[in-house]
Amino acid sequence: MKNMRVFYHYRLSVLLTLLTLGVATLGAKEIGNRYQGSAPALEGKIHVLTCFISETGWTAEEAEKSSAMIQEAEDWLVEQARNYGKEVTFVNATAGLDTPLLYDNIISGNGVGNEPVNLVSKLMPKLGYSNGLEYAKWISNNTDCDGCMVLIIANKPGRGYSMAYKNAFDDKLYYLEGTMLYTSYEEGMPNCAASIAHEMCHLFGAEDLYATFIQTEENEARARELFPDDIMLRVSYNIKTQKIDKLTAWLIGLTDEMEEWYLDFLYE
């Protein structure tokens, strides 16, 4: 691959308390878009490019900790998929460690929906691709992967968010789906694998189940009764206490079993 070292492997309160999720979601897939974008579903072989961006550079220890969190998130997703009879393999690549990807004033998400959603497309020229669509086509034509995504992570505090694709978006700019992650939350508590898995699920088509600027408090209350451990409702430092429940499983392609009332949780 161009300018990348590829490696393969099958890879907010106090510690061990349940966290109220501090993330925002931009462009979570609507029902008609469940199998759209570069990461159409949680199944098959999925290529994950992790881009380590920074204002000053990454230390080896920082990169190792973040890589371990990403692998823990991936391993959990593989296990959850198997609960629904699906086999998933993640194929990983990294950028930004051997040759730093430096930016001035990396901003945080804010939870109100006006975060920049073009970060993936802006990053691609630094890796030798004119845009995200060209990269996604390269993966499709040169690997046996069924989908791909980009995890952008900055070594600073921030509020993570996802950049999922919708049919109305410009393919060159937005078809390649990605997330913006940080090594710690805004309050300074370290990030965790569950938050990463949550954002990855958004790219596969999942919706937030907690109240946001587009999800209702009524739906959050209902989700707490129906799906109390779902990864899209809350996250925990102990990801083993979490699950992909049946609504999220349907949205991300793990099952075709669907109840009509699932639609009540979907937002535009």
Residue ranges and their predicted role:
Residues A24-A28:
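Sec/Tat signal peptide C-region and signal peptidase I cleavage site
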Residues K29-C145:
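Propeptide-to-catalytic entry region of secreted or membrane-anchored zinc metalloproteases
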Residues Y129-L173:
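Auxiliary, metal-adjacent structural segments of Zn-dependent hydrolase domains
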Residues A194-L209:
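Active-site recognition of the HExxH zinc-binding catalytic motif
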